[in-house]
């Protein structure tokens, strides 16, 4: 049986930390779906389609990685895709409490669902999408925090939004 895992998130925008978790999960699972959440409650900087496009560009050379958007419950999305594993990243103890609650909620909705937690590598432990967004908004250098092949695209999308296009 081939194993399929889902790595869900808002990815607003994707960071090197996210990409590292995707690559490391590929060592464990045959196929990984990077599931981009609509997440209107977080009021993302980039639209769902833009975040999907950024992730597709960031993962274009990774075999057996698929990028899809979703706007349903994660437990339902996993069931629809036939996945039994959810991948999550934990940067700090504060992440663990939140992720534990979400993991239990998902398991209550889909008892076959397991959540696997990855710690970031030391070089990526401080990176978050909110830190990257703040740096972008203040015209700081951010390209070392995001996948190299997506940095220019992320910046062009940001400037397009800033101009109101």
Curated annotation (Swiss-Prot):
One of its GO terms (cellular component) is cytoplasm. It is an enzyme of class 2 (transferase). GO terms for molecular function: ATP binding; pantetheine-phosphate adenylyltransferase activity. Its EC number is 2.7.7.3. Its cofactor is Mg(2+). ATP binds at residues 10-11, 18, 89-91, 99, 124-130. InterPro entries: Cyt_trans-like (IPR004821), PPAT (IPR001980), Rossmann-like_a/b/a_fold (IPR014729). The keyword Nucleotidyltransferase applies. It comes from the Bacteria. HAMAP family: PPAT_bact. This is Phosphopantetheine adenylyltransferase. It comes from Helicobacter hepaticus (strain ATCC 51449 / 3B1).
